[in-house]
C-alpha cells in the first residue's frame, strides 16, 4: 500500500520535506482513498504503484533545472512509467513523443532515439511531471477528480517559490494554464502548442531544447544532454 501514511510514502527525501504539509491535508487523504478504492475494485491502474512518484524520485527538488508538464499518464498497457511523455524501452513510441523527437532533431540535430525512455533527462534535472499521477487502463482522464492536481500544483508552486532560474516548458493549453503558479520574474516560461498530432504542426519550431540550454548556460549551470543513451 503505497500511500498509507506520510512515513510510508515512497518519495525522494527533499521532495518529501518540501511537500510534507500537503501529505497531512484532507485532500491528500481523499486522493489516497480514491486510489485505493479504484485499486480494490479490480481496476488496472497506471503507472504501477511503485512508479507513482517516479518524477519526484528521479529528480530531487534541489536538482530541478527545468520542468516539462504533462496532463495524465498513458492509459494503455506497459506505457506509463511516472514520467510525462516517457515510455519504457521496448514500447512503441506514442505519437506525441515522436513529435518531440522530431523537434529535437530540427532544433539540435539529434536523431530520434529508438526508444522512448526519458529517464536520462529526469536524472539531469528535468522534472517530468504529469499533473494527474494515475489513470485507469483504457480510460484517459479517469482520475482527474481524485485531487492529484492540488498536489502537483503545490509541487509547481514550491519550485517557483523556493528556487530561481528554473525553465518551465509548457506545451499545450493544459500546461499553459499552470503559468499562474510560476513567478516569471524568477523563472523562464517557454510556451508552445502541444506535440500531439491533434495540434497540427504548431509545436514544431519552438526551439525549446536549445533555448533551455542557452538559459542554463547563462546561469552558469550544466546544460542538458538531450541525446538519449541507447
From Swiss-Prot:
- Give the keywords, sorted: Cytoplasm, DNA damage, DNA repair, Hydrolase
Which E.C. number(s) belong to this protein?
3.2.2.27
InterPro entries documented for this protein = UDG_fam1, Ura-DNA_Glyclase_AS, Uracil-DNA_glycosylase-like, Uracil-DNA_glycosylase-like_sf
Catalyses which reaction?
Answer: Hydrolyzes single-stranded DNA or mismatched double-stranded DNA and polynucleotides, releasing free uracil
GO CC, sorted alphabetically, is:
cytoplasm
* One GO MF term: uracil DNA N-glycosylase activity
What CDD domains does its record include? UDG-F1-like
Q: Which Gene3D superfamilies match?
A: Uracil-DNA glycosylase-like domain
Q: Which domain of life is it from?
A: Bacteria
Where does this protein chiefly localize? cytoplasm
The residues responsible for catalysis, as annotated, are 72
Q: Where in the cell is it found?
A: Cytoplasm
Which processes are annotated in GO (biological process)?
base-excision repair, AP site formation via deaminated base removal
Keyword Manganese assigned? no
- Is Nucleotide-binding there in the keyword field? no
| Similarity remark | Belongs to the uracil-DNA glycosylase (UDG) superfamily. UNG family.
Role description: Excises uracil residues from the DNA which can arise as a result of misincorporation of dUMP residues by DNA polymerase or due to deamination of cytosine.
* Matches recorded under PANTHER family: URACIL-DNA GLYCOSYLASE
Write down what this protein is called.
Uracil-DNA glycosylase
- In its UniProt entry, the species of origin is given as Wolinella succinogenes (strain ATCC 29543 / DSM 1740 / CCUG 13145 / JCM 31913 / LMG 7466 / NCTC 11488 / FDC 602W)
The beginning of the lineage is: Bacteria, Pseudomonadati, Campylobacterota, Epsilonproteobacteria, Campylobacterales
